[in-house]
Swiss-Prot record:
InterPro entries: a-kinase_dom, ALPK1, Kinase-like_dom_sf. Serine/threonine-protein kinase activity is stimulated upon ADP-D-glycero-beta-D-manno-heptose (ADP-Heptose)-binding. Keywords: Cell projection, Cilium biogenesis/degradation, Cytoplasm, Cytoskeleton, Disease variant, Immunity, Innate immunity, Kinase, Serine/threonine-protein kinase, Transferase. This is Alpha-protein kinase 1. Residues 1017-1237 form the Alpha-type protein kinase domain. Belongs to the protein kinase superfamily. Alpha-type protein kinase family. ALPK subfamily. The gene is ALPK1.
Length: 1244
């Protein structure tokens, strides 16, 4: 029986019985005892024997018959899967009967026995609920190491890396001890440790730490060989993983690994190239597990991939290319033949592997014979199978899964028929590999003997530090038997806790009075107290345990919502003259640029309107889009715009609950008026937010006020009367509102001026632009710019050159000399048709004065407005803070007003919220300017809400492009055979930059369908981008607590992901972007990973028990035939609470212990890069005490070398880091002997 629904129902019944027994424990009836005995007697004798041996704790893992035998007889070639599958229903009935009879030892033995089989059915989560329930009912019940380790595997798959690391490190450090389990042999402990080391290697592989992962896999091989009888199954798995790692490993790392005197694998000595070594390792892996089809399928898939990659590399001699392709063909065919016609395939891992084998074989045929009709048909079938596979993996209905599984395998059968896959003759009909794969299994794969325990000692520091992070007391002391030796039990391993001691919103959120600001010091104490309290929470014999068990299942059966920390309370520690915390109740604001905060398109209006659901977020730690002011007196000059206020109604505020923060003086927000002009304009009050349901074209405005005040009301304005002596509108509130909208600002669309700004009131005073410089504002076309409050954008070295653009359909436009606009219109988002969508409330840095060539906020005083590059852009001109311009009398109709922005706020990053018409900001992922070199535009029909656009990803355009330009873009998007060869072999940044230069911008890729794609990985060590052909399915948007403003995130499943059962997230920009946005994101993240790897080594050398990891990121270039249709970045899904430790300018959160390590890492990156780079903008997942493991993502890098993206401030950013964030070296810096540089403020 392998029907998932039936299995799930039976397991649910077992869980319900346990739940009832946990609530009340009646005496066991004679009827229950006899039913238990009856069910056990009905089992086949082989299963009864296995249950008895499991009860006696005879082995820590249920062994295959062939697993430890050198000479395998006919009776040993039966797989355990077949035996368990045949009697599964009887076993589960016996499990229920044993629970009712209160024979927890027998029940735990059955759980142990069926564990691996149910993992293949994707229902391990429900089985683990039963195991935990047994432990809670009778804590002395032995729970097998295999079952405990299963929890670690599922945690890795679901993104709970901290949880998995703790379980594995506990077992390794405690010599395999878990609960009351007793080992019969010392070698069994070695086996458990070897498996744990192997899974830790897979975690590092998932994190892109190829060399370090390979070292751990090698260690596991040593452990398996150290057993009295080598574990062939363990060796097969480790060799396959090692080969898979070699595929991604750089040549330099491979040479280092190969030449390491402690690593003595013989297969490394036989081959010079890492891909050939990997292929041989897979051949050996398949031979070791020749009687288990899934193991063979996995191994030969990796072998075929290795040979495919090698045939495309520059190292492969041309005369040997076809030979290796034929070997790859054989490997994929062997994999496809592991499925017999009458055998069902019921698990995601096996289905994925079959689709991958079919695609690999199709790719080989294309390389050998070209794009024939047969190959094209097979390619289409593979994409069809990928779509069905994704639906299978996300479906919760057993009938659907069963039908989809059959459909997938039916498609695979068609591929086999198209490509004429023929079975091979084999003397041993039970073997799934050909005779040519046979080798002497007693062949030494190690030169000499490795000392496994000595190897473990080298990792003991890491395992100890991870264990120290978490509590080890069992939460169930109530029913503990006095004579039971509990040891390290599964409850102590935190298997019932969704998020282990990560810094969370619930731990950090203090109770705040509605109208009272809270000081930074008080808040810090509250946070520490809550962390201490939360870190010592023990689960009792109560509902809390059962609820948490349900949470574990959700992570396996279907993609769960993100659990992110955007609602967490953050405290700001600032150097300089700035005062303490400025807490704003901005539940719609997100303090990071990670994929944890990306948009999920649901209508959350009702949520926004609900009171009492506010999350406190420190808006001052957002990453800025432009620099902060050096001090209050050094504001930039602001240019005036001549436009007319048009159809704007302001509502009268209700200021009953508005009070200033205890730590901040009440500030007024002057509005900057402008001279009248005949063109209609746009007005925005200071800190205004866009209201829901506003009329089309003009939205209501809600006041946000300065961010360093605290308030909890919703002021709105029905009218605004102006007073010349006040410099601001009467009745205008000066406090932030608490709605869950996201911040935005309005930019008038007008051509850039010559920037001849005169000093009207002396230094630091802005002046109006002359009448001749008045620019147009387009009717009913406000440009809603979403300042994401995330990453500051550089203002240096950005040329400002403009073409004149006339578009008759827009009506009368007054043109300026050298004028232009940025044709960077957003694409339509899934929720873009909703009126008055949410926007985040957040202050904007006053230093952001103009918009650069990518829509960046730039400093208008530092940058000339013209050059010869022909870039189109918008310009935003603002008044410096503190300066009050003269205000006209009551009429405001002839003025455009810009807000005076909060001075202690880092600014914004791009986003494209519903209702936005033009997005002029840049996201934290910086990019170069080449993709913005746009063609001239002519009149034509529009699509969506905007009058212009580049050529979109489907090959059509919103307006007509000149024929020649359109042809050039389409040609640039079409990859030629030579391009494919270069990409598959590996290319450098410069080649890729030039090749993609004229591809234009792209709409977001289409979801809910499978695409052909190129997977591109970047190695900082080799500085190469290497491609791999694959198929990707773009799934549903993620359900997240907070919407992102610049990118959408969605589930992604592709054939060549590192972890078949793992979850991956794709990120795509909401608005049309050029390809290089994604590529620079990945380059920057992998550069930060390169630096942090070296930093970790230094920490380890100094016995500092902390390790930092950057989540790896890759590119998927979406293709249709050979034409580029889009681009997304992909990274593993990490589950946990997300925190932001610093930004890329001056803000840093010193109350987190992790920040100390992060700042030391930034300092180290500066020294390690020979004073060229500093990694900043620290954000990710940290533990409560800042020790153990820290996972980071989305960094920024200030570099003196490259200015390819505007979030790089160069020398100025490095100055900010050492003078504002890392003011003094900490203990970590001293222990690493880091030298503090002498910093002088760079000229701007």
């Amino acid at each position: 029986m392998n029907n998932q629904k039936v299995v799930a129902v039976l397991l649910q019944e077992c869980k319900q019985v346990l739940d009832q027994l946990l609530l009340e424990a009646p005496d066991v009836s004679e009827e229950d005892k006899s039913e238990d005995q009856r069910c056990r007697a009905l089992l086949p004798s082989e299963l009864r024997t296995l249950i008895q041996e499991a009860k006696e704790m005879k082995w820590p893992f249920v062994p295959e018959k062939w697993q430890y035998k050198q000479a395998v007889g006919p009776e040993d070639k039966t797989n355990l899967k077949d035996v368990i599958g045949a009697g599964l229903q009887q076993l589960l009935a016996s499990l229920r009967a044993s629970i009712l009879a209160r024979d927890c030892a027998a029940a735990a033995a059955i759980v142990f026995l069926v564990d691996r089989f149910l993992y293949g059915l994707d229902v391990s989560g429900k089985l683990l609920q039963v195991a935990k329930g047994l432990h809670k009912l009778q804590p002395a019940t032995p729970i097998a190491p295999q079952v405990v380790i299963r929890q670690a595997r599922i945690s890795v798959n679901s993104g709970k890396l901290l949880k998995a690391e703790y379980i594995l490190s506990s077992l390794i450090s405690n010599n395999g001890a878990t609960g009351t389990w007793l080992y019969r042999n010392e070698s069994d402990k070695v086996l458990v440790q070897s498996v744990c080391i192997q899974i830790r290697g897979q975690i590092l592989q998932k994190l892109g730490m190829w060399y370090e992962a390979a070292e751990l896999i090698w260690a596991s091989i040593v452990g398996y060989l150290a057993l009295p009888q080598p574990d062939k199954k363990g060796l097969s798995t480790s060799l396959g993983i090692l080969a898979d790692i070699f595929v991604s490993m750089s040549k330099n790392d491979y040479e280092k690994f190969k030449n390491n005197p402690q690593i003595n694998l013989s297969l490394l000595k036989e081959f010079d190239h890492h891909l050939l070594s990997a292929a041989e390792a897979c051949k050996l892996a398949a031979a070791f597990s020749a009687y288990t089809p899934l193991f063979v399928l996995t191994a030969v898939n990796i072998r075929g991939t290795c040979l495919l990659s090698y045939s495309s590399s520059n190292d492969c001699p041309p005369e040997l290319k076809n030979l290796h392709l034929c070997e790859a063909k054989e490997a994929f065919e062997i994999g496809l033949l592991t499925k017999r016609d009458d055998e069902p395939v019921t698990g995601k891992q096996e289905l994925h592997s079959f689709v991958k084998a079919a695609f690999g074989l199709t790719t080989v045929h294309r390389r050998l014979h070209g794009e024939t009709g047969t190959v094209h048909a097979a390619s289409q079938l593979c994409k069809e199978a990928m779509g069905k596979l994704y639906n299978f993996s996300t479906s919760s209905r057993s009938q659907d899964r069963e039908a989809l599984s059959q459909e997938v395998m039916s498609v695979i059968a068609q591929v086999k028929e198209h490509l004429q896959v023929q079975s091979f003759s084999n003397v041993d009909d039970r073997s799934y590999v050909p005779e040519s794969f046979e080798c002497r299994l007693d062949k030494l794969i190690l030169h000499g003997q490795g000392d496994f325990q000595k190897i473990l000692d080298t990792y003991s520091q890491h395992h100890t530090s991870v264990c120290e992070v978490f509590e080890s007391d069992c939460g169930n002391n109530k029913n503990e038997q006095k004579d039971a030796k509990t040891g390290v039990c599964i409850t102590a391993l935190k298997t019932e806790i969704k998020n282990i001691d990560t810094v969370s919103t619930t731990q950090e959120k203090p109770h705040c009075q509605r109208d009272t600001g809270i000081s930074s010091s008080l808040m810090g104490k509250n946070v520490q107290r809550e962390l201490r309290r939360g870190g010592r929470r023990n689960w009792t014999h109560s509902d809390a345990f059962r609820v948490s068990l349900d949470q574990d299942v959700e992570t396996e059966t279907e993609p769960s919502d993100y659990s992110n920390g955007e609602g967490a309370v953050f405290n700001k520690s600032l150097s300089g003259s700035q005062t303490s915390s400025a807490w704003s109740n901005l539940s719609g604001f997100s303090s990071s640029a990670s994929w944890e905060e990306v948009n999920y398109h649901v209508d959350d209006r009702s949520a926004r309107k609900e009171p009492g659901k506010e999350h406190l977020v420190d808006t001052q730690c957002s990453t800025a889009l432009s620099e902060e002011l050096e001090n209050d007196r050094e504001g930039r000059a602001m240019h005036s715009l001549h436009s007319q206020l048009h159809d704007l109604s302001l509502q009268e505020p209700n200021n009953d609950n508005l009070e200033p923060s205890q730590n901040q003086p009440q500030q007024q927000m002057p509005l900057t008026p402008f001279s009248p002009h005949n063109t209609p304009g746009i007005f925005l009050a200071p800190g205004a937010g866009l209201l829901e349901g506003a009329p089309e074209g003009i939205q209501e405005v809600r006041n946000m006020g300065p961010r360093n005040t605290s308030a909890h009301s919703r002021p709105s304005y029905r009218s605004a009367s102006w007073s010349s002596d006040s410099g601001r509108p009467k009745n205008m509130g000066t406090h932030p509102s608490v709605q869950k909208e996201e911040a935005f600002e309005i930019i008038v669309e007008f051509p850039e001026t010559n920037c001849d700004v005169k000093d009207r009131q002396g230094k630091e005073q802005g002046e109006e632009i002359s009448e001749r410089g008045a620019g147009p504002t387009f009717k009913a076309s406000p440009s809603w710019v979403d300042p994401e409050g995330e990453t500051a954008e550089s203002t240096e070295d950005a040329p400002l050159d403009f073409h004149r653009v006339l578009h008759n359909s827009l009506g009368n436009i007054s043109m300026l000399p050298c004028s232009s606009f940025t044709p960077n219109w957003p694409v339509q988002n899934p929720d873009s048709r909703k009126s008055g969508g949410p926007v985040a409330e957040q202050g904007i840095d006053p230093d952001a004065s103009t918009v650069d060539e990518e829509g960046q906020l730039l400093d208008s005083m530092d940058v000339p407005c013209t050059n010869g590059h022909g870039s189109h852009r918008l310009c935003i001109l603002r008044q410096p803070p503190g300066q009050r311009a003269e205000t006209p009398n009551s009429s405001v109709s002839g003025n455009i007003l810009f807000p005076v922005l909060s001075e202690d706020c880092t600014t914004t990053e791009e986003g494209n919220q519903p209702g936005n018409m033009l997005n002029c900001s840049q996201n934290s992922s910086s990019s170069s300017v080449w993709w913005l070199k746009s063609p001239a535009f002519s009149s034509g029909s529009s699509e969506g809400d905007s009058p212009w656009s580049y050529l979109n990803s489907s090959g059509s355009s919103w307006v007509s492009l000149p024929g020649k330009m359109r042809k050039e873009i389409l040609e640039a998007r079409t990859l030629q055979p030579d391009d494919f060869e270069k990409l598959l072999a590996g290319v450098r940044h410069d080649w890729l930059f030039q090749r993609l230069e004229n591809t234009g911008v792209f709409k977001p890729s289409q979801l809910h369908r499978a695409h052909s794609a190129l997977l591109l990985k970047y190695s900082k060590k080799s500085e190469l981008w290497t491609a791999q052909e694959t198929i990707v399915y773009l799934g549903d948007y993620l359900t997240v607590k907070k919407k992102g403003r610049q990118r959408n995130a969605f589930w992604v499943h592709h054939l060549h992901q590192e972890e078949i059962l793992g979850r991956y997230v794709g990120k795509d920009y909401k608005e049309q972007k050029g390809l290089w946005h994604h590529f620079t994101d990945v380059e920057r993240q992998m550069t930060a990973q390169h630096y942090v790897t070296e930093f970790n080594k230094r920490l380890y050398e100094q016995n500092i028990p902390t390790q930092i990891f950057y989540i790896p990121s890759t590119i998927l270039l979406i293709l249709e035939d050979k034409t580029i249709k889009g681009c997304i970045s992909v990274e593993p899904y990490i589950l946990g609470e997300f925190v932001k430790l610093s930004n890329n300018t001056k803000v840093v959160k010193t109350e987190y212990k992790a920040t100390e390590y992060g700042l030391a890492y930034g300092h180290f990156s500066y020294e390690f890069s020979n004073h060229r780079d500093v990694v900043v903008d620290l954000q990710g997942w940290v533990t409560g005490n800042g020790k153990g493991l820290i996972y980071l993502t989305d960094p920024q890098i200030h570099s003196v070398d490259q200015k390819v993206f505007t979030t790089n401030f160069g020398k100025r950013g490095i100055f900010y880091f050492f003078n504002n964030q890392h003011v003094e070296c900490n203990e970590i810096c001293h222990r690493l002997s880091l030298t503090r540089p002498s910093m002088e403020k760079p000229c701007t």
